[in-house]
Amino acid sequence: MALRPGREGGESSAALATAQARFSRGEFAEARELYSAFIGQCARHGSKCSPEDLATAYNNRGQTKYFSVDFYEAMDDYTSAIEILPSFEVPYYNRGLIRYRLGYFDEALEDFKKALDLNPGFQDAVLSLKQTILDKEEKQRRNAEKSY
C-alpha cells in the first residue's frame, strides 16, 4: 500500500509528488529512482524534509521493491519508515504482508497488530491478521500431524 506525500515541504514535497505520480502510472523503476533521490536529498545536512514525507518516501520505495519481488530490500525500507515515524501504520502493514508471504507468521502478526493499534479501522490489516492466524494454526496442525 503506497501513500501520497504530505502537504509540507515545498520543493521537496514537489519532488515526492513527482515520484508518486510515476508510481501511480505504474512506472515503478522511475518512481524508485525518484524516491531514492528524495531520500538522499533528505539525508543532506540542513534538509527540511518532514518526517512524514521521508517516511512516505521509504514506504513507497519499499512498494516498488515489493513489486519487483525484492522482499528483503522492501522490508528494509518499511523498517526505515517505521524508525522515522513510528506512528505510521502503513509500513507495519506492508512489512507484515511480506513476513506473511515468507512464512514468518509470528513477525507478521506483530506487524498487523501494531498497524491496528495505530489505526483500529484499517480493514486490510484486520483481514490480514485473521488470515495469518488461520494459516499459522494450519501450519502448526500439519507439523503436529507429521510428528505422529
Curated annotation (Swiss-Prot):
SUPFAM superfamilies, sorted: TPR-like (SSF48452)
Pfam families: TPR_2
Listed InterPro entries: TPR-like_helical_dom_sf (IPR011990), TPR_2 (IPR013105), TPR_rpt (IPR019734)
Domain of life where this protein originates: Eukaryota
Keyword Repeat in annotation: yes
Renumbered ranges of TPR repeats: 12-45, 55-88, 89-122
Alphabetized UniProt keyword annotations: Repeat, TPR repeat
Identification of the protein by name: Tetratricopeptide repeat protein 32
Origin species: Mus musculus (Mouse)
Lineage: Eukaryota, Metazoa, Chordata, Craniata, Vertebrata
